[in-house]
Structure formats: C-alpha cells, structure tokens
C-alpha cells in the first residue's frame, strides 16, 4: 500500500488520549480501536458530572475545560480535592468496582469530556483481551502512583502535626 505510514491528521480525541498516561504506549491501531469506545460529553460551568454516592459508570478525560473534584454536600461545606484541566482524567475507580462515587465532579468551565465506561471496557476485554489488559495494567500503575502520593502527603501532614 503506497499510503502505509502516511501521517493523516489525528482527531482531537486521539490527540487528547495521547496526553493521558494510561494510554502512553498505545499504537495507532490501538488508538483507533479505543476511539470507537469513547463517548463525548459536554457540560456547562457548574454542572455536576457526577455526585458523591451516585453509581460509578466509568472514567472521564478532559478534552477541553476544567473540573473540580469535591467532597461535602453544600457550597459552604465543600472541600476541593483536586482541580483538573485538559488531559487530566478522573473517576477511574469505577472501572474496577461497583462501589458508588466517593466524591463530586463539577465542571468549573464549559467542558468537553471523553467518557470511557465499564461496559465498553468489558466488551473490549472480550473482543481484544490484550488491549483490555494493557488498559487495566496501565490504570493500575497510575492508581499506584496516586496512592503513593496520597501516602506521602499523609506522612507529611502527620509530621507537621507532631512538630
């Protein structure tokens, strides 16, 4: 094929996915397969993407915009856990268990998100087990990094309280 290796312009979806550590070592073919499973969602500033204790359906990747992750039920009792921007992802624990959400996710600007949901991961596991395992393995690595960061923060906080 004379077009083999020809560099077509990538979709915005693939450009965004390439920024996400979970998909860091994917081939173009794997990105094409993954792109078929992605759901596009749009939120206005102030919209809840999900609420604490709601059923978890999957993870979201920020293509454009910003999102804050909070705990607490009222505006004046809200603790911001994270402020996220383009290329960041959240809600990934829903891909591993059936537990309800442990926080709120709220758009802080008009936002375009990519959704990757549990049912799509399950279907991918059946159709292409190698790619499904690659996603889960990479997600596990990211979760491990986040847990280490949380542990270090906890140790630092405890050290500051002792002093």
Q: What is the meaning of each model-derived region?
A:
Residues 1-163:
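Cytosolic regulatory regions built on CNB/CRP/Popeye-like sensor folds
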């Amino acid at each position: 094929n004379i077009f083999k290796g020809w560099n077509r312009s990538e979709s915005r979806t693939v450009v965004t996915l390439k920024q996400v550590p979970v998909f860091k070592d994917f081939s173009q073919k794997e990105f094409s397969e993954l792109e078929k499973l992605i759901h596009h969602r749009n939120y206005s500033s102030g919209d809840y993407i999900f609420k604490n204790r709601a059923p978890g359906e999957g993870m979201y990747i920020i293509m454009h915009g910003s999102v804050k992750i909070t705990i607490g039920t009222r505006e004046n009792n809200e603790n911001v856990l994270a402020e996220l921007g383009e290329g960041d992802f959240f809600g990934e624990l829903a891909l591993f268990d059936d537990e309800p959400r442990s926080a709120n996710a709220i758009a802080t600007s008009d936002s375009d998100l990519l959704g990757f949901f549990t049912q799509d991961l399950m279907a991918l596991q059946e159709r292409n087990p190698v790619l499904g395992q690659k996603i889960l393995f990479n997600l596990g690595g990211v979760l491990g990094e986040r847990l280490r960061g949380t542990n270090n923060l906890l140790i630092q906080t405890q050290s500051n309280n002792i002093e």
